[in-house]
Swiss-Prot record:
Assembly, per entry: Constitutive homodimer; disulfide-linked. Forms homooligomers. Interacts with S100A1 and APP. Interacts with S100B, S100A12 and S100A14. Interacts with TIRAP. Interacts with HMGB1. Interacts with LGP2; this interaction plays an important role in AGER-mediated pro-inflammatory responses and cytokine release. Interacts with double-strand break repair protein MRE11 which is a core component of the MRN complex; the interaction enhances MRE11 endonuclease activity and promotes DNA repair.
Free-text function comment from the UniProt entry: Cell surface pattern recognition receptor that senses endogenous stress signals with a broad ligand repertoire including advanced glycation end products, S100 proteins, high-mobility group box 1 protein/HMGB1, amyloid beta/APP oligomers, nucleic acids, histones, phospholipids and glycosaminoglycans. Advanced glycosylation end products are nonenzymatically glycosylated proteins which accumulate in vascular tissue in aging and at an accelerated rate in diabetes.
UniProt gene name: Ager
UniProt protein name: Advanced glycosylation end product-specific receptor
Domain of life, per lineage: Eukaryota
Keywords: Cell membrane, Cell projection, Disulfide bond, DNA damage, DNA repair, DNA replication, DNA-binding, Endosome, Glycoprotein, Immunoglobulin domain, Inflammatory response, Membrane, Nucleus, Phagocytosis, Phosphoprotein, Receptor, Repeat, RNA-binding, Secreted, Signal, Transmembrane, Transmembrane helix, Ubl conjugation
GO molecular function: advanced glycation end-product binding; amyloid-beta binding; DNA binding; heparin binding; histone binding; identical protein binding; protein-containing complex binding; RNA binding
Gene3D superfamilies from the UniProt entry: Immunoglobulins
Record field: transmembrane: 341-361
Residue spans, topological domain Cytoplasmic: 362-402
InterPro entries xref list: CD80_C2-set, Ig-like_dom, Ig-like_dom_sf, Ig-like_fold, Ig/MHC_CS, Ig_sub, Ig_sub2, Immunoglobulin_dom
Length: 402
């Protein structure tokens, strides 16, 4: 149940109970003392009275003793017959009854229905938008209220007037959480709107209400936002995989309609000028392609604030192995075959060049030896002549001695 409905139902039940039971509805702030008077009770002893209560602290009716007891820290009877709750809490919500006999001997009953409340801090709009775009959904912000009891409600206002969600141009997402220890509530309300074109600078605010009498709502600081006209989407592009749109029979073709626009437009597909009966999607998958899938494809993007925009067409063609144009998967194989052939030719030329070089080198070796042989013979003749001249000089030197 939404927090607002729960609060209104609580107020209605409280009013009906007071009317039917003839009791009095009491609201007390959490943590503050509360005094309930016992009607008809004498202000001074001797007194004949009885207080009993049924609250979150008890499983059934609890009768309090005028002489005091363990419950004095929670609720105790004062000398004048009134009941004091030193510090009310959520567990003190419930029914309190007093039965007293006045001086005339008449019995008087008092009934109280006690509810507690806690006023939270001032609500706040977190993550507010800096501007709004016309004709498209925009998140205005999130209104947050912390530390309330009961939960209460959050409401949005536009230019000072209550903004009622319609589920179309005005959307509100609410969330209510309760602290497991304190029992206090935290409320969050996210507002999304679709501004109209040509609008001015709208002012948004949020308010919190406990739904109790004589309690004024708490308001956030207002935020004023600028509404800008949506610009035309950029060019639409149709991507195809495999590139070129050529595929072997049984292969897969993926068509992607790429367009930069916010919010994303609806994309429909066209084949050979006729719309395809498919759900809107920016991706078209063609598995196990056959010749019946051949044709010209294009995509049409429809933006809320602009007319439809069609992409340039692409052609899908199914080719058998050996046909003109390589089939999908054969491009890499033919490329590798060509590379291997080129490497084989280069390797063969290299071997031939090595053989020719070896043959030429072998032919040049005998010529070099022939050239070296005469040179060595002349050297020997020169050496012989030198030796003869040296031998002739030696006797002459011997004859000239003493």
């Amino acid at each position: 149940m939404p927090a607002g409905t729960a609060a209104r139902a609580w107020v209605l039940v409280l009013a009906l109970w007071g009317a039917v039971a003839g009791g009095q509805n009491i609201t007390a702030r959490i943590g503050e003392p509360l005094v309930l008077s016992c009607k008809g009770a004498p202000k001074k002893p001797p007194q004949q009275l009885e207080w009993k209560l049924n609250t979150g602290r008890t499983e059934a009716w609890k009768v309090l003793s005028p002489q005091g007891g363990p419950w004095d820290s929670v609720a105790r009877i004062l000398p004048n017959g009134s009941l004091l709750l030193p510090a009310t809490g959520i567990v003190d919500e419930g029914t309190f009854r007093c039965r007293a006999t006045n001086r005339r001997g008449k019995e008087v009953k008092s009934n109280y229905r006690v509810r507690v409340y806690q006023i939270p801090g001032k609500p706040e709009i977190v993550d507010p938008a800096s501007e709004l775009t016309a004709s498209v959904p925009n998140k205005v912000g999130t209104c947050v209220s912390e530390g309330s009891y009961p939960a209460g409600t959050l409401s949005w206002h536009l230019d000072g007037k209550l903004l009622i969600p319609d589920g179309k141009e005005t959307l509100v997402k609410e969330e209510t959480r309760r602290h497991p220890e304190t029992g206090l509530f935290t409320l969050r309300s996210e507002l999304t709107v679709i501004p109209t074109q040509g609008g001015t600078h709208p002012t948004f605010s949020c308010s919190f209400s406990l739904g109790l009498p004589r309690r004024r709502p708490l308001n956030t600081a207002p935020i004023q936002l600028r509404v800008r006209e949506p610009g035309p989407p950029e060019g639409i592009q149709l991507l195809v995989e495999p590139e070129g749109g050529i595929v072997a029979p049984g292969g897969t073709v993926t068509l992607t309609c790429a367009i930069s626009a916010q919010p994303p437009p609806q994309v429909h597909w066209i084949k050979d000028g006729a719309p395809l009966p498919l759900a809107p999607s920016p991706v078209l998958l063609l598995p196990e392609v056959g010749h019946e899938d051949e044709g010209t494809y294009s995509c049409v993007a429809t933006h809320p604030s602009h007319g439809p925009q069609e992409s340039p067409p692409v052609s899908i063609r199914v080719t058998e192995t050996g046909d003109e144009g390589p089939a999908e998967g054969s491009v890499g194989e033919s490329g590798l075959g060509t590379l291997a052939l080129a490497l084989g030719i280069l390797g063969g030329l290299g071997v031939v060049a090595l053989l020719v070089g070896a043959i030429l080198w072998r032919k040049r070796q005998p010529r070099r030896e022939e050239r070296k042989a005469p040179e060595s013979q002349e050297d020997e003749e020169e050496r012989a002549e030198l030796n003869q001249s040296e031998e002739a000089e030696m006797p002459e030197n011997g004859a000239g001695g003493p």
